[in-house]
């Protein structure tokens, strides 16, 4: 029996957001059940820690230097072949409901089809998907959800005003003044989380059992802004939320942690260096209070609970159609969120667990007869496309650089899964940052800093995460670890694929 594939993604969710991964705040029972009944990959990393490059890797099974989407604001050529094309060519119906972000949101509609689909009353086909209905976590003027909300003008005006003439907004309506916390008077059932699950069920309802489907259900949350329906504030009292383990109200302690790392970490914290273009220009993390960190975490976990319930709703629909027996379900995110770790917020050129370490779960179809398992060996987004092909019983496209995910730790060892790679390359005028990371199964994480406006190419980070899971002691310059550093950097550059000769232009900020 041919198997269906449901890929569920969130945007900016930490590994420890889920109960099955040690989370203690949000109730994520539906996603936790996928873990219990399926395979939980305990060391999955993205290949880039921001949206567009990470999503391009999911779409192609390629590392960043191969697909060329090095940072937000870049887009693969529209004609570039993707895993959605490949599955479609082999008999699958294909759809994406929710956040795509394969093209810049702030790019011109004339240049990018995603930015004019809704205004043209189109749902595709596009980039291999027969059907697309798009949503974002703010109103940029051209998503299907944006158009849907035109029927609710008062509620639409209640959403966070994300972009101002100064760039990304920092305004707040929260109890603590925390940036981008914005409870709003909007019914939950028209909020984008439930909209995505409802549109997913609607498309699935058009499918028959005689043809397989590949459906990507992509939630815009828990990405900032944290503008949740105010009716849901009762779920988690921000005053009861514990501070993150890697946050301290002692500024001197935070600074001592940051001083272990290269200069742009401390520079972001105190506002002395502007290298993180993924956060509002006017936001200075050092100004955050402990209560603001608590409130942001509470809003994030409320969004996580809403996502979990939406996931449960769609899984219930699959049960009603008797599709669980031949449907494989994947759950992951594009990247994480600092969420107060090291006194920081948002994301950027920081290769730490908060941003790289992903929730990553595969619930195989019942007909696959695959036992539940936990896999400790490293895997990544780069492996998803090849796994989808293995499920479909087809060979992956030649451009795929990953391999099918192991279904047990024994299989991971047989596959010789020892490393996973993550890249960062951003260029904004004179400000550029270039980081390359390798995580090894023995627990070492090594990040090489290449030459940039700030670094001369000799800097880096090295952590023994078995002894130092919080990445507080940087061993890069420790003579006792010089051999480890050399071996890992050599392995890193030997393992990275050749860089594509195609230099994609950056067309918009995001």
Named regions from a protein language model:
Residues 468:
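Intrinsically disordered, low-complexity polar regions and short flexible loop motifs
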């Amino acid at each position: 029996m041919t198997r269906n594939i449901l890929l569920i993604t969130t945007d900016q969710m930490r590994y420890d957001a889920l109960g099955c991964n040690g989370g203690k705040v949000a109730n994520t029972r539906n996603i936790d059940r996928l873990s219990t009944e399926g395979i939980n990959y305990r060391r999955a990393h993205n290949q880039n820690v921001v949206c567009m490059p990470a999503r391009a890797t999911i779409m192609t099974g390629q590392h960043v230097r191969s697909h060329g989407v090095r940072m937000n604001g870049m887009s693969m050529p529209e004609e570039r072949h993707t895993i959605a094309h490949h599955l479609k060519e082999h008999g699958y119906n294909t759809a994406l409901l929710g956040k795509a972000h394969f093209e810049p949101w702030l790019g011109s509609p004339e240049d990018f089809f995603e930015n004019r689909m809704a205004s043209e009353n189109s749902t595709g086909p596009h980039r291999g998907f027969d059907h697309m209905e798009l949503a974002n976590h703010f109103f940029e003027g051209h998503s299907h959800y944006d158009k849907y909300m035109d029927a609710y003008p008062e509620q639409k005006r209640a959403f966070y005003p994300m972009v101002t003439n100064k760039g990304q907004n920092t305004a707040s309506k929260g109890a603590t003044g925390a940036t981008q916390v914005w409870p709003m008077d909007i019914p939950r059932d028209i909020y984008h989380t439930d909209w995505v699950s409802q549109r997913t069920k609607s498309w699935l309802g058009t499918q028959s059992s005689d043809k397989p489907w590949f459906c990507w259900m992509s939630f815009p949350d828990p990405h900032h802004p944290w503008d949740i329906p105010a009716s849901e504030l009762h779920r988690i009292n921000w005053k009861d939320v514990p501070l993150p383990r890697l946050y301290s109200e002692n500024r001197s302690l935070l600074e001592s942690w940051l001083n272990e790392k290269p200069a742009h970490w401390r520079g972001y914290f105190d506002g002395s260096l502007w290298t993180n273009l993924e956060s509002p220009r006017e936001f200075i993390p050092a100004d955050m209070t402990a209560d603001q960190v608590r409130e942001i975490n509470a809003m994030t976990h409320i969004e996580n609970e809403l996502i979990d319930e939406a996931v449960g709703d769609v899984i219930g629909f699959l049960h009603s159609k008797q599709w669980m027996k031949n449907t494989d379900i994947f759950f992951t995110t594009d990247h994480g969120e600092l969420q107060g770790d090291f006194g920081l917020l948002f994301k950027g050129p920081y290769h730490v667990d908060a941003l790289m370490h992903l929730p990553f779960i595969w619930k195989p179809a019942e007909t696959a007869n695959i036992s539940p398992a936990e896999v400790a060996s490293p895997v990544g987004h780069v492996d998803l496309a090849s796994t989808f092909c293995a499920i479909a019983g087809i060979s992956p496209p030649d451009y795929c650089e990953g391999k099918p995910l192991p279904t047990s730790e024994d299989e991971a060892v047989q596959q010789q899964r020892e490393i996973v790679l993550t890249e960062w390359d951003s260029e904004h005028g004179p400000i550029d940052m270039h980081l390359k990371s390798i995580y090894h199964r023995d627990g070492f994480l090594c990040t090489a800093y290449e030459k940039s406006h700030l670094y001369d190419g000799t800097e880096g980070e090295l952590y023994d995460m078995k002894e130092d899971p919080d990445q507080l002691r940087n061993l890069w310059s420790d003579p006792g670890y010089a051999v480890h550093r050399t071996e890992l950097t050599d392995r890193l550059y030997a393992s990275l694929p050749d860089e594509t000769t195609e230099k994609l232009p950056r067309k918009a900020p995001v």
